[in-house]
A protein has these predicted regions:
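Middle-to-C-terminal accessory/interaction subdomains
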Residues: 1-22, 26-184
Length: 184
């Protein structure tokens, strides 16, 4: 259950929507267990990939209730009638009060820990310093796809959009928790 919880916590906090959770989710496990490795116990675990939609729409998406508005169903990620096995697993776990309380507490705390604003902004600046020098080369190779200036300061998916999302997302998390609790 920890894998499900932690995976959905991150996906919800970053508001990775559009093509998740309908697709772009996967699970893994080892075939041969190894007692010296806590992740080599043979249990299935969710894994992240293709999360590029998280936070890229900027400030407006910071206010999205990802629990409610994902999965294209009236109850979003809490829909127990879905055919999506990832969402179905999560929805049933959320029907357990202890799991739900733990999930909600951890979601609120992510704004103070893993996704604390200054830490996330510092990480974004670190990525900008690594990748910005490559932008001119990239856009020269792929003309008519944008520019270095747009990648940093343009609209959708620019660094500025991600920065705006990071600056506001923590303020919306309580409303996500409140909505989630109102469903039970």
């Amino acid at each position: 259950t920890d894998s499900v919880r932690d995976y959905f916590l991150a996906e919800v906090w970053i508001n990775n929507k559009w093509d998740w959770p309908g697709k772009n989710w996967s699970m893994w496990k080892v075939q041969n267990t190894d007692s010296s490795n806590e992740y080599a116990d043979g249990k299935w675990r969710f894994m992240f990939y293709d999360i590029e939609f998280g936070g890229v729409s900027g400030e407006g998406d910071a206010w999205t209730n990802t629990m409610k508005e994902d999965n294209y169903k009236p109850k979003g990620l809490l829909d127990t009638d879905t055919k999506n096995p990832a969402v179905l697993s999560f929805a049933y776990l959320m029907s357990n009060e202890d799991f739900r309380n733990d999930f909600n507490d951890r979601l609120l705390k992510m704004s103070e820990g893993t996704f604390e604003k200054e830490k996330a902004l510092d990480r974004l600046a670190e990525f900008e310093s690594i990748y910005s020098p490559l932008y001119e080369q990239f856009f020269a190779r792929y003309p008519d796809t944008g520019s270095a200036e747009e990648a940093l300061h343009g609209g959708y998916a620019s660094s500025d959009c991600i920065r705006a999302f990071i600056n506001k997302r923590d303020k919306s998390i309580q409303s996500i928790v409140d909505w989630t609790n109102s469903q039970f």
